[in-house]
Amino acid sequence: MERRRVVITGLGAITPVGLTAGESWQAVKNGVCGVAPITQFDPEGQKVTLAAEVKGFVPEDHMSRAEAKRMGRFTQMAVVAAREAMDQAGFTPAEEEKDRCGVIVSSGIGGLAITQAEHERGKARGWDRVSPFYIPTGICNMAAGQIAIATGFRGMCSCPVTACAGGTYAVGDAFHYIRDGYADVMLCGGTESAVTPLAIGGFTAMRALSESTDPNAASIPFDARRNGFVLGEGAGILLLEELDHALDRGANIIAEVVGYGATCDAYHMTAPRPDGSGGAKAMAIAIADAHITPDQVEYINTHGTSTCLNDSGETAAVKLVFGGHAKELAMSSTKSMTGHMLGAAGAVEAIFTALSLKDGFMPATINYKEPDPACDLDVVPNEGRSADLHYALSNSLGFGGHNGSVLLKKWEA
């Protein structure tokens, strides 16, 4: 089967540090921290009081009130990010093209806030008074479905629910779908909005979240002081396109997708394999998929959650794959700025990785103070760096043992 080349021609994002992909990337380049006290509910009585919320997003600025009411917040953000990606790509499909255009968008939790609200409504008013919009606005796949409705894309439409790796799986699956000839254009990525009492309470009970009250000492990947992640929210959508299709219409190409690997630890519900072997295999598969060698990779946008087990395990994984080259490459965590956006994380981080290649810039791991001997690689501490990058990986590791890695290449016409 012919291996077609796949490029990125459009980006859209809503994150804790910006309401567009461009705003978010500029904030990341500037080292802006999106962690702050929770505002979406009163966290009094909770051990965790910080989150990385999206600030200033008003859905009615982008759609009618009636449309907004028929979407959960996670879907609203995904649809707006998809429109941004389409606009940046300058792509309006002809009617006959729409069967060759598809959507793959992940969400790990979907409309959790909707579930909480409707549960309270059912208890108070009777279960037959639950909103008829509860199910279609709350289910995880509705972000993908609403994007397809908004764009008219009639090809493959899917929602990988692989926890924190979902956004990366969406990008990787879309890449393979185009590469192998099943589509010409795919909107792909992830979305999440789960800053709710139930989610905060659940993750806190697992001891997964940082209980720090200092926004600059909560999401601190690879730092010896780290003690949990900060829950974030947002959406990231990429428009992937077959190369000739993009060139024929004169599209502006941002980066090329060249490899994808996915594995499972098959080890534990939430903990990664301590030796990093599952994540290592995902990276190795992505590198082999691209027909390059490990020493050609110069930068990794890591999963880097700020949990003790993840960061040491991912460091071990990098050493397994790259050997001596691990000390030469750079790897940073933009979750130090955005928090952990769960199903949206991998998509937003793929966007940042594409822009790292385009702009020749490696973002920092901010608020880094105390080195950890178990995380002894170059984490680009505190200050981002300019670099002429050619290949970069974006990693995601999810509960359930899901590992995903996407390999991107600098676009050179």
Feature annotation, model-predicted:
Residues 1-67, 89, 244-256, 351-365, ...:
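ACP-dependent fatty acid/polyketide chain-elongation machinery
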Residues 5-9, 33-37, 214-290, 299, ...:
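Condensing-enzyme catalytic core mediating Claisen C-C bond formation in acyl metabolism
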Residues 8, 24, 29-162, 191-200, ...:
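Conserved beta-ketoacyl condensing-enzyme motif
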Residues 22-27, 113-127, 177-180, 200-213, ...:
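A glycine- and small-aliphatic-rich helix-loop capping segment at beta-alpha/alpha-beta transitions
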Residues 78-91, 140-143, 148-192, 230-251, ...:
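Active-site-proximal alpha-helical scaffold in enzymes
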Residues 85-97, 246-252, 283-299, 321-325:
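Phosphate/pyrophosphate-binding loops at sites that engage ATP/ADP/AMP, CoA/4′-phosphopantetheine
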Residues 124-131, 169-172, 176, 192-248, ...:
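Glycine-/small-residue-rich "gating" segment that lines the acyl/pantetheine channel
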Residues 182-227, 260-274, 304-311, 328-378:
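Acyl-CoA/ACP chain-elongation machinery
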